[in-house]
């Protein structure tokens, strides 16, 4: 359901990367369904002063995914120069599995939002959705560009937590879990809105 990377549509991918692309498609569709039929006031409605609106949940994901994808792209470019091959399926280590699990919905604990991920309030659902899908399209392009690399061996510095380094493969799984976490949060806002 990508909005448009034609190059991406014509190339086959390993199963693990195809699964991530399929998840991005499902996430895009979930986001579309969440905002469809909501007025701008409903997209920006917050159940409490400290809670996020549906729009803020999606804007946060778009911002975080975009910043993270940019950091991943830098690591992949460097790996392409150094030719870290052959490719192996994504296999996070114990820390990677733990980190992915911490991101999953429903949240087990609240996490502090990095400055770059604090969403603006009062945007239209259409504008938020466009930015969200554009961030996913950037990620789709990156996945295709990295399809021949061993994503377990390419490490990068997390742009939000500078001391944290982990593999590009783990980061792709973290992005999916983080997206599910905040889509779950947005659904909870919709449920609260109907009460």
Language model region names:
Residues 1-195:
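Aromatic-glycine hotspot motif
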């Amino acid at each position: 359901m990508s909005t448009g990377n034609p190059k991406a549509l014509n190339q086959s991918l390993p199963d693990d990367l195809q699964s991530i692309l399929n998840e991005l498609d499902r996430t895009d569709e979930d986001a579309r369904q969440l905002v469809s039929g909501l007025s701008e006031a409903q997209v920006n409605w917050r159940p409490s002063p400290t809670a996020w609106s549906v729009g803020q949940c999606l804007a946060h994901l778009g911002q975080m995914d975009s910043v993270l994808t940019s950091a991943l792209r830098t690591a992949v470019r460097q790996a392409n120069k150094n030719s870290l091959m052959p490719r192996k399926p994504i296999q996070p280590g114990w820390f990677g599995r733990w980190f992915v699990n911490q991101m999953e919905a429903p949240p087990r604990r609240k996490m502090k939002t990095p400055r770059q991920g604090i969403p603006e309030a009062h945007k239209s659902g259409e504008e938020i959705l466009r930015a969200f899908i554009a961030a996913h399209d950037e990620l789709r392009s990156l996945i295709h560009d990295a399809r021949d690399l061993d994503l377990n061996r390419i490490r990068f510095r997390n742009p939000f937590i500078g001391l944290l380094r982990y593999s590009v493969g783990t980061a792709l799984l973290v992005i999916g879990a983080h997206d599910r976490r905040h889509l779950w949060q947005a659904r909870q806002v919709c449920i609260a809105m109907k009460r």
